[in-house]
Amino acid sequence: MALNKSMHPRNRYKDKPPDFVYLASKYPEFQKHVQTTLTGRVTLNFKDPEAVRALTCTLLKEDFGLTIEIPLERLIPTVPLRLNYIHWVEDLIGGQGNPQRGIDIGTGASCIYPLLGATMNGWFFLATEVDDICFNYAKKNVEQNHLAELIKVVKVPQKTLLMDALKEESIVYDFCMCNPPFFANQLEAKGVNSRNSRRPPPSSINTGGVTEIMAEGGELEFVKRVIHDSLQLKKRLRWYSCMLGKKCSLAPLKDELRKQGVAKVTHTEFCQGRTMRWALAWSFYDDVPVPSPPCKKRKLEKARKPLTFTVLKATVAELQAQTPHSSPTESVSAWLENILTDLKVLHKRVPGGEVELSLFLTAVENTWIHSRQKRREQGRHLRELPRAQEPPSEETSVTEQQQQPDIPPESPANAEALQHFLFKCLVNVKQEEEKDVLVEMHWVEGQNKDLMNQLCTCLKNALFRQVAKPT
């Protein structure tokens, strides 16, 4: 299943994927690699490195005005994925157009992160590279796009990450980016050690030199070395970040940062095509805002979806018969208010229109569970009675009443009780086209959303029970 809808919201390819027909008509080199199916659909063979390279070069030219060269024996980046990372860095550092300074660890032959960052946002980059071929291509790509004033490509020794690259620097950088080698050995690179044997093979080709795709210990150990460097550099960079090819690497790396006492940590997901990547970022600055991880965003989105049930037209008509001269929404709302009063759930009306009414609820005690238990107990007791009992004599009744302790009347919830509420929610009662009435319960805040689920079920059942009572 394609993941394009989960791309970063600012990614230009999120809602408008590349138009292969248009690109093929404009760029002859790209046109060589497109294929037309029997149904007339234009496709690209993503297992062909030349086709992937043609697409990358074409998109960079068409959408960013960049001209680059990439050798087939080195890593060929996909533009939507790299763009996701750039946009996330924008979120970390708090701006798209501000002049910022960044470091790209292992920039690759394409030098794609610095080229995109400089072109889109005017960022300054220090781009490091250990491989001779990648270094030469990266320098050439920077020069032919006239970006040498913004991007400095430097050749560094093997296993150099941040410490050696910055030993002669005194500048404070805003961020670093890194696309580390994902694999520890050839078997991993070929997918032999996949944790899921049922996982389908990759839909795209895996190009790249040895230093680009493999490192001792794989990406886990590589990123731990970046963390080790960051512990020495600390505030020389505002944000440290690394991309990850395996989700299973995320938890141990977060644990490592926690052990080292790093408080500002966040992560994200990069979704594109059929590929997912993850990224981790951390900072030693107290004043940097930390973007929410995607899982928290999804929980917030899920929380916004209301619980609903529908009161059908026939049921609404019965309610209206019992409450004359009232609209469908007014009848349903009035019955809901009666039930809520019986349950001792605080509620008040919120101004609304003719076709929609709203109630704001504050639950301070779980009375609906007690109500259900009480009904069950009454039913069980009635079933166990052998015969109808004689009504108590007036004398007995008076005696029992005298023996009962004084029970104070129910008092409304005080301010202290309201401070310790179970949850608050907004109930919307809406009339639909077929004269049905829709009841929505929107979570506002509280201890546990399951409590609102229980109350929703209780309201629905109580409403229908009242309608079903013989008149």
Curated annotation (Swiss-Prot):
Annotated region described as K-loop, given as residue ranges: 159-163
Binding site for S-adenosyl-L-methionine: 82, 106, 110, 129, 160, 179
Gene Ontology MF, one: U6 snRNA (adenine-(43)-N(6))-methyltransferase activity
Protein's UniProt keywords contain Oxidoreductase: no
Segments of this protein annotated with the region VCR 1: 284-390
GO BP, one annotated term: regulation of mRNA splicing, via spliceosome
Catalytic reaction(s) noted: adenosine in U6 snRNA + S-adenosyl-L-methionine = N(6)-methyladenosine in U6 snRNA + S-adenosyl-L-homocysteine + H(+); an adenosine in mRNA + S-adenosyl-L-methionine = an N(6)-methyladenosine in mRNA + S-adenosyl-L-homocysteine + H(+)
Stored SUPFAM superfamilies: S-adenosyl-L-methionine-dependent methyltransferases
Region (VCR 2): 421-470
Keyword S-adenosyl-L-methionine: yes
Keywords tagged on the record: Cytoplasm, Methyltransferase, Nucleus, RNA-binding, S-adenosyl-L-methionine, Transferase
Location of this chain's protein in the cell: Nucleus; Cytoplasm
RNA-binding as annotated region, ranges: 17-20, 194-206, 245-249, 272-278
A cellular component term, taken from the record's GO annotations: cytoplasm
Record entry for activity regulation: Methyltransferase activity is autoinhibited by the K-loop region that blocks S-adenosyl-L-methionine-binding. Upon activation, K-loop changes conformation, allowing S-adenosyl-L-methionine-binding and subsequent methyltransferase activity. mRNA N6-adenosine-methyltransferase activity is inhibited by zinc.
EC numbers: 2.1.1.348, 2.1.1.346
Family per record: Belongs to the methyltransferase superfamily. METTL16/RlmF family.
Purpose: RNA N6-methyltransferase that methylates adenosine residues at the N(6) position of a subset of RNAs and is involved in S-adenosyl-L-methionine homeostasis by regulating expression of MAT2A transcripts. Able to N6-methylate a subset of mRNAs and U6 small nuclear RNAs (U6 snRNAs). In contrast to the METTL3-METTL14 heterodimer, only able to methylate a limited number of RNAs: requires both a 5'UACAGAGAA-3' nonamer sequence and a specific RNA structure.
Domain notes: The VCR (vertebrate conserved) regions bind the first hairpin of MAT2A mRNAs. The VCR regions interact with the internal stem-loop within U6 snRNAs, inducing the conformational rearrangement of the A43-containing region of U6 snRNA, thereby modifying the RNA structure to become suitable for productive catalysis by the methyltransferase region.
Name of protein: RNA N(6)-adenosine-methyltransferase mettl16
Record gene name: mettl16
